[in-house]
Design a protein with these regions (language model features):
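The substrate-binding groove and active-site-proximal loops of carbohydrate-active enzymes
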Residues: 28-39, 64-79, 126-145, 167-174, ...
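Short, well-ordered coil/turn segments that N-cap beta-strands
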Residues: 24-28, 55-57, 89-95, 157-162, ...
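Conserved, mostly hydrophobic/aromatic
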Residues: 30, 51, 59, 88, ...
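Polysaccharide-binding and catalytic clefts of secreted carbohydrate-active enzymes
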Residues: 122-309
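Aromatic-lined substrate-binding rim segments of carbohydrate-active enzymes
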Residues: 45-54, 60-123, 152, 249-256, ...
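Carbohydrate-binding surfaces of carbohydrate-active enzymes
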Residues: 213-216, 259, 290-293, 298-690
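Short, acidic/polar
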Residues: 37-53, 144-150, 267-277, 343-351
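N-terminal carbohydrate-binding accessory modules
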Residues: 13-58, 71, 86, 409
């Protein structure tokens, strides 16, 4: 019985934008909802003209069009879709066609109420909103298959169809009896015996021992919240269950349209699903990029740096295939607490950053604002006035022209000498841990800051999962990798012993893959020998509370959040010490030679100045190619068999002068050498032919 829940994953092909379209184009488009405007043929005709004027070459159709495709059960109408695709294709615009399964029609919920989701409080949803169907439901999957088969029958042969877009922003748990049953089967398949599960979950705590798998319930809000292993396995199951649902779509689509690639829109640092697992069902990955521009507590430069991390996180799901952004806003969103406009120049630079970080496409939500619904005030290329001479429309047109100039980079891949390890299981375990800072562990802030630190040194970095090979990297960073799964310690040990450099931080290797604390000291799984340190205690600082780190040259840097107390081995070099509190003089940063390589450890959350000292020393020792960049300038690099592409992005409002190699600036068409001055939110993309 459990075995039938293992999805036989499709072996994906290596699609690139060139192989998808048979032509070297960089995707420039947006989410288009003609189904909301069928009573206005004049607008539909004008849309295509305006798309062409704006430099668009793709449009995403049908994301939430199920009720228009199938207004009543078994009654289908795809005529408007075919007509729309015809108009677009005649104008040189390709269609990315969504399966409309992100929201079901009202008639379906009324006739088949068993497909409704059940929330964590045990209450069944009413029909409404989106992501509102149980992914386990056989009836829902049957209806999904029906609509997909009809879609393929109607437009699967259309020359403008270039990819399938599965559902939309997948996510959400379901706690219905059917999902609970599947969860128990999943647990049986994983643990085999109830004794093994009891040990892994440490159920002796608070007398929560299970006698049988049938006693197990999901972690309801008003139920079992004390077993961290249960909570983690529920998150893992939710990812597995959603991936199994996605497989039910991809398997059918690959059978019906084997030459049309499949993707979906992921959501940056999304907590609900493990994207390293979900990506197995996709031919390439896309994501929706909605940075929080204009926050008073965060600079534009920091926001760009966090976006660069998000690009690296998503592209790391499929490292050797270019990604693109499926959605971004040309102006503002409608769901932040305060919704500010992008400042002039930011949209263009955001698009260029996407390409610099390995993307082969930049697309918007939405093409035209809808007249009603909760997204009526969400930014769009075309506003309610329908004009093509607005500031936003001109901005998008100029951005698309700049993106078009980057056509030569299509299919090239980022050249990264360093990698950060990010693991969704570890993230979930840390967030659920009852300790440290209970509500906010600040993992995202830390991983983004350390990724930015590598970039400040001019070193591009990937963000990869724990299962990925480390062979291509000189430096590997383990930021707050709270969970170290059995065997990962040996992987790091071999990497360092063979000449690699690793940088570990506080909260490394506290628990195993069941959230049980490693015994014998931290970091566990043999990593103490690699780093030459043992973390004996952890001090958590209040917001606004700081310590200092003192370097041998007398310079100091600030510390916030966490301070680990270390014991060091005799052959471990102390690079910096605490400057305050009872642990003044204890090691904060260390270096340990191990085999042919080197292991650095940072025991506290230091500021950028403190991290810079340790990171530059580590990367210099590893032989990384470093640069000295002005504050606020990002550097990214892509490479293919023909050329190397160097990107320099000024994320500030002041001019910055950067040293560049000799080559052609693709954005201006001019030859550059030695130095280039970048204006406010300016950029250059230097192509150096091999």
């Amino acid at each position: 019985m459990p075995g039938r829940y293992k999805a036989p994953y499709f072996k994906v092909k290596r699609f690139t934008m060139k192989t998808i379209t048979k032509a070297p184009i960089l995707f420039r488009g947006g989410d288009y909802n003609p189904d909301q405007w069928l009573d206005r043929p004049d607008i539909l005709e004008k849309d295509v003209e305006m798309m062409k004027k704006a430099g668009m070459n793709t449009a995403t159709l049908g994301v939430f069009a199920w009720a228009k495709y199938e207004p009543q059960e078994g009654a289908y109408d795809f005529s408007w879709l075919r007509e729309t695709m015809d108009r677009l294709y005649a104008a040189g615009i390709y269609t990315e066609l969504a399966t409309p399964c992100g929201a079901k029609p009202n008639w379906m919920a009324k006739k088949y109420p068993e497909i409704l989701r059940v929330q964590a409080n045990g209450v069944t949803d009413h029909q409404g909103m989106r992501h509102n169907a149980c992914p386990s439901s056989p009836i829902y999957r049957e209806k999904v298959h029906n609509i997909i088969e009809k879609l393929v029958e109607a437009v699967g042969d259309h020359p403008g169809l270039i990819l399938w877009h599965i559902s939309n922003e997948l996510g959400g748990d379901c706690y219905c009896p059917r999902c609970q049953t599947r969860f128990r089967y999943w647990l049986r398949d994983k643990y085999k015996t109830i004794d093994a599960l009891n040990h892994a979950w440490w159920t002796g705590f608070w007398s929560h021992h299970y006698n049988d798998f049938d006693e197990i319930e999901p972690p309801f809000e008003n139920g079992e919240q004390s077993l961290l292993g249960l909570k983690l396995d529920w998150r893992r199951f939710t990812t597995w269950n959603m991936t199994d649902y996605v497989h039910s779509e991809t398997e059918l689509l690959h059978k019906l349209t084997p030459n049309v690639p499949i993707t979906t829109n992921l959501m940056e640092y999304f907590p609900g699903l493990d994207y390293h697992y979900l990506q197995k069902e996709l031919d390439f990955v896309c994501w929706d990029s909605y940075p929080h521009w204009g926050r008073p507590d965060r600079s534009i430069t920091t926001t760009f740096a966090m976006t660069a991390f998000d690009h690296a996180l998503i592209r790391g799901c499929k490292r050797d295939v270019p990604f693109f952004t499926m959605e971004s806003t040309p102006s503002l969103v409608n769901w932040h607490e305060y919704n500010k406009l992008k400042r002039p120049g930011v949209n263009r630079l955001q698009g260029l950053q996407t390409v610099a970080c390995g993307g082969d496409g930049v697309q918007y939500f939405q093409w035209r604002k809808g007249r009603g619904g909760t997204e009526q005030w969400h930014g769009a290329v075309v506003d309610h006035d329908g004009r093509d001479d607005t500031r936003v429309f001109k901005d998008v047109t100029e951005t698309n022209a700049a993106l078009n100039a980057l056509t030569p980079v299509i299919g090239s891949l980022p050249r990264a000498e360093a990698a950060l390890i990010f693991d969704w299981d570890s993230r979930w375990a840390l967030e659920d841990a009852w300790g440290m800072q209970i509500q906010q562990k600040n993992l995202r802030e830390t991983v983004c800051a350390l990724h930015e630190q590598l970039g400040r040194c001019g070193v591009d970095a990937d963000v990869i999962g724990v299962e990925e090979s480390l062979d291509r990297y000189k430096v590997v960073v383990l930021p707050m990798l709270y969970m170290v799964k059995p065997g990962f310690g040996e992987k790091i040990r071999q990497f360092v012993a063979n000449g690699g450099t690793v940088i570990g931080t506080y909260l490394l290797g506290y628990v195993n893959d069941s959230t049980l604390a490693w015994l014998g000291g931290f970091p566990g799984d043999g990593l103490r020998e690699v780093f030459g340190v043992t973390a004996t205690e952890l001090d958590t600082l209040y917001p606004g509370e700081h310590n200092t780190v003192v370097f041998p040259d007398g310079s100091k840097a600030a510390i916030q959040d966490y301070c680990e107390l270390l014991e060091t081995r005799d052959n471990t070099d102390v690079l910096a010490t605490y400057g305050e509190d009872f642990y003044k003089g204890y090691a904060v940063a260390t270096h340990h030679a191990f085999g042919k390589g080197h292991a650095y450890y940072v025991a506290a959350r230091m500021d950028a100045d403190g991290n810079a000292k340790v990171f530059r020393a580590a990367m210099a020792q590893a032989g990384c190619t470093m640069q000295t960049l002005p504050d606020g300038v990002e550097y990214h690099c892509r490479e293919d068999e023909r050329a190397v592409y160097h990107f320099y992005l000024n994320t500030t409002e002041t001019d910055k002068t950067v040293a560049v190699p000799t080559g052609a600036d693709l954005l201006t068409g001019k030859t550059v050498s030695r130095e280039v001055t970048l204006g406010r939110y300016g950029a250059c993309a230097v192509e150096v032919v091999k």
